[in-house]
Amino acid sequence: MSKYSFYINKYQEDLLKDLDTLVRIPSVSDESNPVDKKPFGQGVAHAFEAYEDIAKRLGFEVEQDDGYAISANYLDGEDYVGVLGHLDIIDAHNKEDWEYNPYKLTVKDGILYGRGVNDDKGPLLINLYAVRILRDMGCTFKRPVKVIAGGAEETTWNCMKHYFKTHKQPLMGYSPDGNFPIVNGEKGILTFETSYPKADGVFKVVEIRGFEQDYMIPSQIEVCVYCENVEDLSSELKNAFKDHEATFTFTGKSALTRNPQRAVNPLFALADFVQKYSMYFDGGFVALLSDVAQYLKDPYGQDCNIYYEDVDMGKTSIAAYMLQMKENAYSVRMDLRYPKGVDPLQIEASLCALFPSLKKIREKRLLFVPKNSELIQKLADAYYSVTQEKAEPITKGGASYARVLDCGIAFGATFDGYDTKCHQPNESMPLNDLLRALEIYCEAIYLLACE
């Protein structure tokens, strides 16, 4: 039993009810039709309203930021401790692949299921409860605490851009949108798209399916083609056609594009197939997939001359994904993650030499905080006090709001050894992990704000 156990047990039922309230809201960020005070659509606005109700009930003052972000504040003052998370989510695509309703909290055999239980509604919520528990214990706060929720982390980050235009940076802080023990490095992100013009072919590509979710290598893709003269084809191809159309399916293993080494990318199986039957496909499609296979197969970028390994942050990575058919061209995207010691302009130059019409569509600066910093030392102490394990900092390819902080890192809430299926069907988190993370956050906020 720790000093926080009584209060964690006291609040567990309320915590799960509040998490269910948040999970039930399909708060997918949508900036296509912004209205006053709802720049990210009705879903995010609804989540902000629910968050406000919860925070006020727990004793926070709540500040709205024009619908871009919402802050639950305990005490006033400029030199505050900041906890930055998000209430927007990735849409629960392929609901038939979910074992349980993604928009309802399900607790089964000690596991919490639902969109947002891990990313990031659950971790954000338990930080509200951590502050409440410290107050109940009579702890003296020497610094204010703000638990800030954004509404566009999964998309544009316009939430935090707007918030910090008018709000001072915290003295120090963290984002509960990563992993334990401590994420002191987040690789730089570059996303490019290259396009190849369409040409004539015996096969006309009618549709490409499987790339509905951004920044995800799918487990399966399908290419539907039309052929006018099926009788002219070889027998092995002819049998695949019905009414002049055929659908070819290629399977692999899904993974986030930031972890291409964990995937079996079905794009490369498609590329092999198209190369084998290149005499039937249009030249642009053949050329694009040939270059994808030649330059992007190695997940660390050795084939496209961008490989680098840093002693602290690890290797570069690159993933090919999002094959699309446009009006006059075919395109594919490349998601790159790079450590310190790499010049992003050199990466772009290397890829420009290999791919025509390269267009940069996303860039985020890397984050690296030396492990001897005061912030990391205090968070390491908090982690050790609960787990009795030394907190060795790690680097991730993902992006958290820690990148917008002058002094901040990602800290939890995912523990090593459990696959939360973040951004995928059946997102989940063990209840014991959530409660253990709550205990760690209690100690972390105590060390940052009360000592």
Locations of regions flagged by a protein language model:
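Acidic/His- and Gly-rich active-site-bordering loop/insert found
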Residues: 2-113, 137, 141
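Predominant activation on well-ordered alpha-helical scaffold segments within soluble catalytic domains
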Residues: 20, 52, 125-132, 161, ...
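Active-site metal-coordination/substrate-binding segment of hydrolases
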Residues: 80-149, 155, 168, 424-427, ...
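Acidic, glycine-rich active-site loops and adjacent beta-strand->loop/helix elements
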Residues: 87-89, 145-156, 176-181, 212, ...
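Acidic-glycine-rich active-site phosphate/pyrophosphate-binding loop
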Residues: 94-107, 194-196, 241-250, 381
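Midchain, well-structured core segments that form catalytic/ion-binding scaffolds
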Residues: 154, 161-339
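An extended, acidic, His-containing surface patch that forms the Zn2+-binding/catalytic region
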Residues: 258-327, 333, 337-349, 357-451
